[in-house]
Amino acid sequence: MAKVIIFSGAGISAESGISTFRDSGGLWEEYDIQDICSAGCLDWNYEQTVEFYDKRRFDIKDKLPNKAHKQISKLKEKYPDDIAVISQNVDDLFEKAGCNDVLHLHGFLTQIRCMKCNYTEDIGYSKLKDKWDSCPKCKNKLRPDIVFFGEQAPKYEKLYNEISNCKMLIVIGTSGNVINLDMFLPSYNQKRKGKGIQYSILNNLEKSDAINDKMYSKVLYKKATDAIEEIVQDIEKFLN
């Protein structure tokens, strides 16, 4: 198990120009989110859902990792067994920065999956049907390898296992509305006092009603690219 968990959300990728459904304008405004991001939408709205994710895939093609992605990648390379990088994001900016073994909790945009046999393949930034009309193994429908709202997220189990056993938690660029990690902090959970997480850092642009920042050892309300050097220094100090 890793000693340090770096957990990131949409905020870390926003500085690279990747918008989220909470942002106004852009691709998300062209669609009703419930029609293309909710459980079951592939059953009754398959073509439009595939079209939307084809556009999202193309949209990230030219997006580049920022300073935060790059610094985290270097740190992961230096301490491969001591650091785990876990992301709520479905983009490939960590991978573009050279970061290996990223746990993408909500799927991976450049990857497709068979709806029956779970065959997966990375198709890069291609349109799904430009690559395959159907699963090459069982000939059933393919889908974006993304966790839709209301679907089970199988990688959550690994997330909770990793965080339950880590010693340092870094949270970057997340509102806490989807996944709130406060419960893992000793200051929140009396049963965890004296064990588990010893030091924690929260880095967001601003306060979130879903996160109790008083639970964290250090809070940095600034851009991830502005905070990352201090975060890296704290991690290095902790590991050494």
Residue ranges and their predicted role:
Residues 1-240:
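Conserved catalytic core of sirtuin-type NAD+-dependent deacylases
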